[in-house]
Amino acid sequence: RKTTNFLHLGSFFATLTILFFLCYSYVKTSHAPSSALGWLLLDHSDITETEENPFFLILSSLCGLMFSVYFGAYFFHRHPGTLNEASGVLIAFKTFSFLAILFYSFNHNTLFFFIMNGLVVILSIFTYFIFSLIFSQMRCPLFFRLVPVTCFIYSLFSFFVLALIPLANPSTIQVAGNLLDMLFIVSLGVFMWQRKKKQNKKHFEA
């Protein structure tokens, strides 16, 4: 019963994460960066608070954090030891992402904010890497292995592009990165249901 609640709540917050981000993308009118990578590498000192409108981005990040907690709780109780380390990294990644967005809303011109976003970028790359590694070891279907690998490669690619090629379109690069992060959350949500279906099938056959 408890694990079923974790599964449903995780799916609920995954859906809200995507919906709130789509709302943010729709109402966003300024050139403010929309990810930790953009906040870390791009100059945004001239952006005022009225131009930022981060409300939906904050909600999306908060729901992403809640999803990571329920994802970790589900596998901790339902499949102990399967994804404990990866879930811990995911929760840390989403926690610092949420904190970075909160700091961006109040004061984004501090050294602490710069360090925070550097940590988020590192955690994002490591999160995609560890999930791609674990899903490969678990011999998961191609979709689940391909999504984190794609996110990992694109994270490294976009980091070096934004850092070394200032003429590149930063908005397009960040939007693509955000969409891949949404796809990653979708894949984890589907993975939860796939594991539950597989477990129920084994229980039925037994």
PLM features: residue spans?
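Non-transmembrane, juxtamembrane loop and terminal tail segments
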Residues: 201, 205-206
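Hydrophobic, aromatic-enriched alpha-helical segments typical of multi-pass transmembrane helices
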Residues: 1-200
